[in-house]
Amino acid sequence: LAISYISLINHINSLGEKYQHSDRMILNVTDESHIITANPLLAKFLVKGSKMWRKLGIWLWLATQNMDDFPNEAAKLLSMVEWWELLNVSASEIDEINRFRKLSEAQKTMLLSAKKSDRKYTEGVVLATNMEALFRVVPPSLFLALGMTEKHEKAERRQLMMQHGYSELDAALEVAARIDKARGIA
């Protein structure tokens, strides 16, 4: 994993150098990033890279579902993060975030105020140097239906496929129509 990731990062770095005079930014997005930062060599590599990448127009985005999965070795990297986008976090997750970014009581209160309503919306908080804001994401029903990966959600689509002879897309469209109806917009 380390060799593959370093190769990928080196390629992204080469693209940044090649296009450094372009006004187009490069986003380096790593999902499940706690897996990468658990390797002390990779964490140090990303710290060094991300300091240089700002000059090349490369922005490092790290995503994870669980802050407690980040090892202490990731502290230096996470302390450099300029923008934190936090979706519907719990009190225990706030403690984990506080390991890497000191939060004020007002910020903790704002984080705890973010809510989630299944199949409707998710609220979150943006924390940056010059901005703190509560936001709500209301995805279109089709996006929700296509993104449903829980076992019972997949079983619902499978049942529609079997019952009506639908393709997977047709089943997702049916689920989306049901979500629209439940939202009162159909």
Model-derived features with residue positions:
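Electropositive, surface-exposed helix/loop patches at the edges of structured domains
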Residues: 95-116, 120-131
